[in-house]
């Protein structure tokens, strides 16, 4: 037996992880190479059997990167392995829907919900605490409450920190502009937008230097245009996009040609002005102070733009905890990684999404950040999870390069889809397409992603938050005033649904008790049951269902306007 080994049954940590005591001789080896939580359990009664590894993987962040990463780790690693998610918020929210929240087209509850129960349903631990710092040499993360959590592998998915303080007067807290980077910001922006509608004026949608993922800024400008047209107020509200890009459509990747031309044409068509090569200097009440640069990085002019309402993308930094962890992050607090998304000095630490450092794709006079999207973030997640699993098996890691940029942007009645591959020039693909199908695709993608996060294990039992429970509760509240109601929708087609005799009687009795027509109640319950059914599908079947659904929708759509 090697030095430092322990013998004599399962430890408390192993028991808590679900191991049951058996009559075996078990030897635990503590491997300093990965951390104190990692153990190899070798069973003497199974000669020739492969070594079983118990590992603890900690995921920091419970957003569009962290939660899918935790789900994937739980699926790919062994049942003896432990996954813990740490987040300073107890809820998940779908960030790409924030522009809709800021326009009032979505409510907070539509795209945000407590994440703890969904993690617990998959056997994933959840700690709702802020991260203070990381101690890589000790394989520990230190939390705001003074506690420390040990790990064998650490996956960082914190997202960026909005650095409002780098520009005087910017931001929703103590500043004069709004933000939609977070759901709370978007809710506050919508409240301000409603007040703005009472006394309209110019709107500025801006992007600050060192901001990243700037595509949503254009999206918000087009959504504001669409919303104001619906309200018959567009002629009262000039809209201007202010960007550090050398030209519209650069998007942090140097998009030219088709991308630049289509976006410029779309902005002109919608009457949206734009100012490029603009650096935000400060914001005062109703005034944006900017400097414009030429291609050589020389200031050409400094002036102010008036606004009555503004949404501005701030500079991005890494989370404070990452910046406070020596040897982990660059000068702006982003985690430096190699091509395998590992920290070069700490190969058991991985970083994904916007919390990691990105190389400069295309140099510009004013710094423009990388164009991350849900697609590229999920690519990061897949790579990091696969490499953690490979490390546990003693296999070689796989590279995340070359990467591609791909996203969908809603424009109200239409939308734009952008794809460039690889993300770093020289490129094989670089195009942007517009069409009303993009708007529909983004709606479908939101639905798919939220269903994926809410996916419950097949053995789970329905809770009181199901659609069926909601439908019945609503009917009981409306009892006595429930005249027969047809489900709206021009594409509705009647289905003949066979019911067992007892269930048919049950339906009629329930309908009579609730004072509602039996066919109406049957339709409501069937609609609700179909919605609930999605929660119990495997990820593979859910993805296939969404694909077939899109095909069925496409078959039934009238021919839309041609792509431009």
Language-model features and meaning:
Residues 462-493, 501-502, 554-564:
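A detector of short terminal or domain-flanking linear segments
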Residues 404, 464, 532-564:
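Short, positively charged interaction helices/loops
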Residues 32, 48, 121-219, 223-232, ...:
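FAD-binding core/adjacent interface of flavoenzyme oxidoreductases
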Residues 417-463:
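C-terminal auxiliary extensions adjacent to catalytic cores
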Residues 163, 172-197, 306-377:
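FAD-site-proximal beta/loop scaffold in flavoenzymes
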Residues 375-401:
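Internal hydrophobic alpha-helix adjacent to the cofactor/substrate pocket in enzyme cavities
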Residues 55-125, 209-253:
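Beta1-alpha1 glycine-rich phosphate/pyrophosphate-binding loop at the start
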Residues 82, 121, 125-137, 141, ...:
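A Rossmann-like FAD-binding core segment of flavoenzymes
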């Amino acid at each position: 037996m090697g030095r430092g080994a322990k013998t004599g049954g399962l430890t408390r940590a192993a028991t808590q992880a679900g191991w049951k005591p058996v009559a075996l001789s078990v030897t635990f080896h503590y491997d300093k190479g990965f951390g104190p939580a990692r153990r190899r359990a070798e069973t003497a009664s199974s000669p020739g059997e492969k070594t079983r590894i118990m590992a603890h993987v900690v995921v920091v962040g419970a957003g569009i990167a962290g939660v899918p990463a935790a789900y994937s780790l739980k699926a790919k690693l062994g049942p003896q392995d432990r996954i813990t998610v740490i987040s300073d918020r107890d809820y998940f929210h779908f960030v790409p829907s924030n522009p809709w929240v800021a326009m009032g087209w979505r409510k907070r509850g539509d795209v945000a919900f407590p994440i703890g129960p969904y993690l617990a349903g998959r056997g994933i631990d959840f700690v709702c605490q802020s991260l203070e710092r990381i101690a890589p040499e000790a394989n520990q993360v230190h939390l705001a409450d003074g506690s420390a959590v040990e790990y064998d592998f650490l996956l960082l998915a914190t997202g960026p920190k909005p650095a409002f303080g780098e520009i005087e007067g910017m931001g929703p807290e103590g500043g004069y502009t709004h933000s939609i980077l977070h759901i709370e910001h978007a809710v506050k922006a919508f409240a301000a937008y409603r007040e703005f509608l009472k006394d309209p004026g110019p709107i500025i949608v801006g992007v600050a230097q060192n901001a990243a993922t700037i595509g949503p800024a254009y999206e918000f400008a087009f959504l504001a245009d669409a919303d104001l047209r619906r309200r018959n107020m567009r002629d009262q509200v000039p809209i201007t996009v202010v960007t550090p890009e050398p030209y519209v459509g650069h998007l942090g990747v140097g998009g030219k040609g088709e991308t630049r031309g289509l976006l410029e044409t779309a902005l002109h068509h919608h009457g949206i002005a734009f100012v490029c090569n603009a650096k935000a200097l400060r914001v005062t009440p109703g005034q944006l102070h900017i400097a414009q640069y030429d291609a050589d990085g020389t200031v050409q002019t400094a002036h102010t733009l008036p606004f009555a309402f503004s949404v501005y993308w701030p500079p991005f930094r890494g989370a404070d905890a990452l910046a406070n962890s020596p040897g982990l992050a660059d000068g702006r607090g982003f985690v430096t990684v190699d091509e395998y998304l590992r920290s070069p000095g700490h190969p058991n630490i991985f970083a994904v999404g916007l919390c990691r450092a990105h190389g400069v794709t295309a140099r510009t006079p004013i710094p423009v950040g990388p164009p991350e999207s849900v697609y590229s973030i999920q690519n990061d997640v897949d790579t990091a999870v696969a490499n953690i699993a490979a490390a546990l098996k003693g296999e070689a890691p796989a590279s995340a390069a070359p990467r591609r940029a791909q996203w969908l942007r809603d424009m109200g009645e239409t939308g734009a889809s952008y794809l460039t591959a690889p993300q770093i020039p020289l490129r094989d693909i670089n195009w942007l397409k517009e069409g009303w199908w993009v708007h529909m695709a983004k709606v479908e993608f939101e639905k798919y992603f939220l269903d994926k996060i809410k996916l419950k294990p097949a053995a789970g039992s329905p809770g009181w938050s199901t659609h069926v429970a909601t439908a019945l509760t609503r009917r009981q509240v409306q009892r006595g005033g429930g005249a027969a109601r047809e489900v709206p929708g021009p594409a509705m087609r009647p289905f003949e649904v066979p019911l067992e005799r007892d269930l048919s009687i049950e339906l009629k009795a329930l309908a009579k008790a609730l004072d509602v027509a039996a066919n109406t109640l049957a339709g409501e319950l069937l609609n609700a049951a179909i919605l609930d059914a999605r929660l119990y599908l495997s990820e593979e079947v859910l993805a296939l269902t969404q694909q077939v659904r899109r095909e069925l929708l496409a078959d039934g759509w009238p021919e839309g306007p041609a792509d431009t």
